């Protein structure tokens, strides 16, 4: 209890200092007030911990003095989800004094009722383990499905335990012969991304049509396939054709981030930490094929454009039109903004000199944060140096401001 007394003295000193600061002319400063509040909080925590530790020691001493049968009966009164240490701080022990002795018969009666409820709960759990309901449901399900008409399927679907026993979409209807269940081959795993959406632009229909197994019956295919009007919205191939998955582009083209520069109103698309047009210029980029980008990808190579406040609806319509049609001379490509280099003038950026200074200061460590190029053996042929410098300056605007702000 010596630590508790020290904590009490700290509390009294802190309270006196806070109270005296109201009457003084200058008062105590803000950092001193915060320091006093911090000391006050720590002292309170220490006092409470010492208080509860003392109560716990008293409880342990009382349990050691009690007979073992009474101690076991007290531990059995604890709730199922409550630990034994939490049961120690009951109303009998925390109250203390003659008041607790006066309430002892009532508390014992309440604990006895809790014990009976706990025993009843355990008996119900044991009964459920001995007589599980799903077994009887599954045992009676084949007879009900085989002998009942087709209208009983709705009644079975209302039962929560038999929800998994409903026949699938491709199951035979009423009047057809029910074949016995045979251990057939396991269902095939979902095909690879290349099988879902092939890279050949001559077969665009395969991306939106569901894949059909060679040995499947026509009736099963007709029953399992959704209507033609909902096929684009329900099939994953349609979305893979419009928005290619990260695995289609390779490892280094997996993420895409669009950054809006609030000062210059420039929208910059950064993929996995570097500009996508730098990736497209690479001769070994898997998302653009082997070689330089063709004329079909010229409209999708640039990712920077001017941003105006009233241009969202017009841009959405243009993007919707770009998604509907594939590039005539290339493979399906990620939806990227059109190149508008004529609208963008990097010389008008107010912090171009600051950006160049930051680039020279940070050096390769800062350039590695924005552009992550391949190995030296896979470097593309050098492009126009002035254009690359302008693109780098424009893309570094938001990054440098964020670093300077922090």
UniProtKB/Swiss-Prot annotation:
Top-level taxon of origin: Eukaryota
Entries under Pfam families matching the protein: IER
Pro residues bias: start-end ranges: 182-193
Region (Disordered): 166-195, 216-235
Family under the similarity heading: Belongs to the IER family.
PANTHER family: IMMEDIATE EARLY RESPONSE GENE
Protein name (record): Immediate early response gene 5-like protein
Species whose genome carries this gene: Mus musculus (Mouse)
């Amino acid at each position: 209890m010596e630590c508790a007394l020290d904590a009490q003295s700290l509390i009294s000193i802190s309270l006196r200092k806070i109270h005296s600061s109201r009457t003084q002319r200058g008062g105590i400063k803000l950092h001193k007030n915060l320091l006093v509040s911090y000391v006050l909080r720590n002292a309170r925590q220490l006092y409470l911990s010492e208080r509860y530790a003392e109560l716990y020691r008293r409880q342990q001493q009382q349990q050691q003095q009690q007979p073992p049968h009474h101690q076991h009966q007290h531990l059995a009164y604890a709730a199922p989800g409550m630990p034994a240490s939490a049961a120690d701080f009951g109303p009998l022990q925390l109250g203390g004094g003659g008041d607790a002795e006066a309430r002892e018969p009532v508390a014992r009666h309440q604990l006895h009722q809790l014990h009976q409820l706990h025993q009843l709960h355990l008996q119900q759990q044991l009964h459920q383990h001995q007589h599980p309901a799903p077994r009887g449901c599954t045992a009676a399900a084949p007879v009900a499905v085989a002998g009942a008409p087709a209208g009983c399927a709705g009644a079975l679907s209302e039962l929560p335990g038999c929800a998994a026993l409903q026949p699938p979409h491709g199951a035979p209807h009423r009047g057809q012969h029910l074949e016995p269940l045979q251990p057939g081959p396991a269902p095939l795993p979902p095909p690879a991304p290349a099988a879902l959406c092939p890279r050949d632009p001559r077969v665009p229909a395969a991306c939106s049509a569901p894949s059909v197994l060679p040995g499947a019956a026509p009736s099963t295919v007709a029953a399992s396939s959704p209507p033609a009007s909902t096929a684009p919205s329900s099939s994953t191939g349609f979305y893979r054709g419009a928005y290619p998955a990260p695995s289609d582009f390779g490892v280094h083209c997996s993420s895409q981030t669009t950054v809006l520069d609030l000062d210059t109103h420039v929208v910059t698309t950064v993929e996995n930490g570097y500009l996508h047009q730098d990736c497209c210029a690479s001769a070994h980029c898997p998302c653009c094929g082997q070689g330089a980008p063709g004329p079909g990808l010229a409209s999708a190579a640039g990712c920077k454009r001017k941003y105006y406040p009233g241009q969202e609806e017009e841009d959405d319509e243009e993007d919707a039109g770009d998604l509907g049609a594939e590039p005539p001379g290339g493979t399906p490509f990620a939806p990227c903004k059109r190149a508008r280099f004529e609208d963008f003038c990097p010389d008008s950026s107010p912090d171009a000199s600051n950006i160049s200074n930051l680039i020279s200061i940070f050096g390769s460590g800062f350039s590695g944060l924005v552009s992550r190029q391949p190995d030296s053996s896979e470097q593309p042929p050098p492009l126009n140096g002035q254009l690359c410098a302008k693109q780098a300056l424009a893309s570094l605007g938001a990054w440098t401001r964020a670093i300077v702000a922090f």
